[in-house]
Design a protein with these regions (language model features):
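Amphipathic, interaction-prone secondary-structure segments
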Residues: 13-72
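Short, extreme N-terminal segment that most often corresponds to the first beta-strand
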Residues: 1-25, 118-120
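Intrinsically disordered, low-complexity regulatory regions enriched in serine/threonine/proline
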Residues: 49-120
Length: 120
């Protein structure tokens, strides 16, 4: 099973991303908190190499539906529930932040790949 490089794990951790990787699993869990305290957890398939992992992060970002994720945190009156901000707009903006953070993770991994190809 492919294992993420320790140096990449250290870079992600330094960006306040928690990583749970089981050597026997095809997936890695990436977690972070949004400005409003939303615990965001992503289950990303590692694939056979770092390029596959990077592509899978991008796919997760590209398929992240901010409106749907916002809807999940609204009550029947359109207000935040379960600890989410009261205003729908605030919940939506928090979900946008989460989507941008996922893109940031993609950029970090892509930069790691690019820098290590240059050093080969």
């Amino acid at each position: 099973m492919y294992k993420l490089p320790d140096k990449l794990i250290d870079i992600l951790i330094s960006d306040d991303i928690t990583i749970a990787e089981d050597d026997k699993s095809a997936y890695v869990e990436l977690s972070f908190f949004s400005p409003e305290g939303q615990d965001c957890s992503l289950s990303i398939e590692k694939g056979n190499n770092i390029e596959c992992f990077c592509n899978n992060i991008y796919d997760y970002y590209d398929n992240f539906d901010v409106s749907y994720e916002t809807y999940l945190w609204l009550d029947s009156d359109g207000h935040g529930s379960n600890g989410a901000p009261y205003d729908m707009k605030d919940v939506y903006e928090d979900m946008e932040w989460c989507q941008n953070k996922i893109y940031d993770i993609f950029v970090i991994v892509q930069k790691y790949i690019d820098e290590n190809k240059e050093n080969e």
